[in-house]
A protein has these predicted regions:
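Local pocket/hinge segments that shape ligand/substrate recognition
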Residues: 273-363, 384-386, 390-392, 398, ...
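Detector for C-terminal structural segments
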Residues: 29-37, 321-350, 408-417, 441-558
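A structural "hinge/loop" feature
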Residues: 58-77, 99-102, 127, 180-189, ...
Length: 558
């Protein structure tokens, strides 16, 4: 007798009441099975009370919900922003970093930062948050030599961390730094859970799948990964959070491999972050959604390796810059704004440069590069007196075929290549897979590099333009070295007088403009799509898209 017949025999033996219950149970189980097949990552909560579902595009999905590794993955940053809390937080209304779990006092000489923890702070498991957790996060983890996030570790290089008492921790820095305070927005980790984990192994630890933080939301359903490439996590409002409670009881995040995948299932989400480019019209044409535009402190540029034999000549760099008509490049763009200086605190209009092919050709002539019109084999390419060709290598990241990133990257690179070849350059373009691209960037094996840079909360230029940062882990991608620029960058860090700082910024912008280490092209414009189920969402003056959650206590269900 097979299994089915056995079940039928058992059910026939039931009385009428038991048969009804059995049939109902089978029906419920069948519905649940259908739901799991059709919606393997949940029904998404569109009709559920106080549940708000956001869609995120991330090729790698949500991976590690840990505040010390959010630089690796934007999707992780979104979730971590709600799960964890730091000593300080970014306030988009004041555009400043303000007190959060810690109350800060700074010494008169601006080298000592003392935090006193608020009363009543608790982790999501109900245990108290103390200064020991702060000391553990910064001293035992970030400053450990084996900690893998080199950029974060560099931010605290030379910093002395002292545990004063159970509520107080002190940070001592070598020199005043107006930007240093922005480092304290980093979420704090629970010592009582992670003290036995080697910092070198923290990125792979299971804690990152179902973390315990002290933020406004706690994990309700741990991180799940599905065969169709989606990842999902559900958070619930934390009863232990010290701040104002949100009206949103549950936040659900679903990460899709591509925007196309998300749009196919857009009726399953309430909000979508970082909509851009050709996808804008998909939401404009959908009556459910309205779009909120926002910009981030980031830009895309072509960095010129000043250690390249050809690019060591300023006239060559000037020719590359002057030949690019940014207005033509961006004429049909709905998600890009022209940029002429990397200093986001300054007005871009004040640093506008004029495109001129005549000046570009003149600069190449001044550099000693001429056409060899009499030689057919050398036609169209300039050469110097040593018969060295005006030949450059140009690298860019290769994105997945058919994606918006791939289309836009190729479009811009091909535009630039066409312009430069028209004035006598021979450009060898390489689109490189992610790991190869990173390797080439770290080793600085390129003449021209097409890439974007994000500045973060402090707008500190040190990492990007100081000569000490032209290293594999540094972000001085042009190998730009200038004593005057280094001095200005250091003064901007050390001077707390705002007028003096503004003057130094303008002088720095002037030096960068004159030296031409890069061609600054544009900054992206993004859109947040919301179906209006909640009100109060603001994207004004955010630094990261996740900063919208700074005001989540003001979000209300309509």
């Amino acid at each position: 007798m097979n299994f089915f017949h056995k079940v039928v025999s058992v059910v026939r033996a039931y009385d009428y009441r038991d048969k009804v219950i059995s049939v109902a149970a089978v029906a419920i189980f069948s519905l649940m099975l259908v739901k799991m097949i059709i919606f393997p990552y949940g029904m998404l909560g569109l009709g559920e009370t106080k549940v708000y579902t956001e869609g995120i595009v991330s090729k790698n999905g949500i991976q590690n919900i840990n505040p010390l590794f959010v630089d690796y993955n934007e999707a992780d940053r979104e979730v971590s922003r709600l799960v964890f809390a730091g000593l300080m937080k970014y306030d988009s209304e004041s555009k400043a970093v303000v007190d959060d779990m810690g109350m800060l006092s700074i010494s008169e000489d601006k080298t000592e930062y003392v935090f006193k923890m608020r009363d009543g702070l608790k982790w999501h498991d109900g245990k108290p948050v103390t200064a020991e957790d702060v000391y553990f996060t910064f001293h035992d983890v970030i400053l450990d030599p084996s900690f893998p996030n080199e950029i974060l570790k560099m931010n605290f290089s030379g910093v002395n961390v002292e545990l004063v008492d159970e509520k107080t921790v002190k940070f001592q820095i070598e020199k005043p730094n107006i930007f240093f305070v922005a480092n304290f927005v980093i979420g704090i980790l629970p010592k009582h859970i992670l003290s036995g984990v080697d910092p070198a192994d923290l990125l792979q630890n299971e804690f990152n799948k179902k973390p315990v933080g002290a933020g406004s939301y706690m994990v309700n359903e741990s991180l799940e990964t599905f065969p169709n490439g989606r990842t999902q996590i559900t958070l619930e409002r934390s009863p232990y959070y010290y701040g104002d409670a949100s009206d949103i009881e549950f936040m659900r995040f679903i990460a899709y491999p591509s925007m196309e995948d998300l749009i196919d299932e857009v009726d399953s989400v309430n909000g979508v972050v970082k909509v851009s480019g050709k996808y804008i019209s998909d939401f404009q044409n959908n009556d459910r959604f309205e779009l909120i535009s926002y910009e981030l402190p980031q830009y895309t540029a072509v960095f010129m390796n000043m250690e390249s034999k050809i690019l060591d000549d300023k006239n060559v760099r000037l020719a590359l810059m002057k030949s690019v008509d940014k207005d033509t490049l961006l004429a049909d763009s709905t998600d890009k704004i022209r940029v002429d200086t990397p200093l986001m605190e300054l007005s871009q209009e004040d640093w506008y440069y004029k495109y001129s092919l005549d000046e570009a050709n003149g600069a190449l002539k001044d550099a000693g590069y001429e056409y060899r019109e009499e030689d057919i084999e050398k036609a169209g390419i300039r050469y110097n007196d040593d018969e060295d060709a005006l030949e450059l290598n140009f690298i860019a990241r290769l994105y997945d075929e058919g994606t918006y990133q791939e289309e836009e990257t190729k479009k811009v690179v091909e535009f630039l290549n066409s312009v430069w070849e028209s004035i006598g350059f021979s450009i060898q373009v390489e689109f490189l897979p992610e790991e190869d691209f990173k390797s080439r960037v770290m080793s600085r094996k390129y003449d021209l590099l097409f890439v974007g840079q994000a500045l973060g909360y402090n707008l500190d230029t040190y990492s990007y333009w100081h000569s000490t940062q032209s290293t594999p882990v540094g972000q001085n991608l042009s190998n730009y070295k200038s004593f005057q620029v280094d001095s200005l960058i250091e003064d901007i860090r050390y001077v707390f007088n705002l007028d003096k700082r503004k003057s130094n910024l303008k002088e720095l912008a002037k030096n960068i403009k004159e030296d031409v280490p890069a061609i600054f092209l544009y900054r992206p414009v993004y859109y947040y799509a919301t179906d209006g189920r909640v009100t109060g969402v603001s994207m004004k003056d955010v630094v990261f898209s996740s900063d919208r959650f700074a005001g989540i206590s003001k979000w209300k269900f309509d």
